[in-house]
Amino acid sequence: QITPERIAINLDDARLADNEGVIRNDVPIVVGGPVAYESTLPIKEFVTAINGAGVPAAVSLSAGAFMCNHIFYVAQDRLKGTTVRSGFVHVPLMDEQAGEFPGLPTMSLDQMVKAVRAMLEVL
């Protein structure tokens, strides 16, 4: 399902290395930054619109503590004090990727496109 994220937390806590081979455990993303930021996107309206387009979606409380959360937090931190709305939306793997990542959820690209269009219509 498509999951717009509600909260980004100021924490990197990963068991896996990032693309540069660095494992960040229990460290703040921005030293001295707020504990968390909320999405400034209309996430509940997104979910209603996505579901209305026939695509499964639900609000997710948190993007976790790895790369997705890191990107979400940095975006919110850099855009604070502006009128630019931002957030993070998780999408599953494409169906074609199922063999590479057994057991992880997948969705057709057509369904993902429907979801993105539904969110854009909300904006």
Residue locations for each model-derived region?
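Mid-sequence, gly/pro-rich, charge-dense loop/helix-turn segments that line enzyme active sites
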Residues: 1-62, 68
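Active-site-adjacent mobile loop/cap segments within catalytic or ligand-binding domains
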Residues: 66, 70-122
